[in-house]
Amino acid sequence: METDRILCGDALEMLRTLPDNSVHCCVTSPPYYALRDYGVDGQIGREDTPAQYVARLTDVFSEVRRVLRPSGTLWLNIADTYAGKGNQGDSVDPKYPNGRTGQTVAINRRVEGCKAKDMIGIPWMLAFALRDSGWYLRSDIIWMKANPMPESCKDRPSRCYEHVFLLTKSRSYYY
């Protein structure tokens, strides 16, 4: 009997290869919105708007929900992003050469409904969208990062936490 398997590839494509109700638990940290460029066309996290990003992840997690057993759980790690002024294009961190996988990319675009430097609210936008699509939103765990990435901002505290949401497919689940 196979007890574990690691699948590498496009999340939707890999999930579609799995049978219904076959997975006990999913632990994931999808690419954050507008923070990295992995050099792959159509990559998650490079959508034009937060709403498109949330919709795309909702589609992926719809497949996760299909493959989870009724008692299964989803543990979702996600962080927020800040809105830009919209006066510049994308900028690449100069310490990474062009084409390097995972280069840091700051997207400086306006976000409808947000002022420049506002937190967008991605974690809760996604959590509420998943709940609306049928997931049970059971818990929000705050992961305090003891050694967070340094930030050059001088007008707010550094981000030192991320959200880990516990979502379930049904009211009765294995915990």
Language-model features: locations:
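Core catalytic lobe of class I
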Residues: 1-175
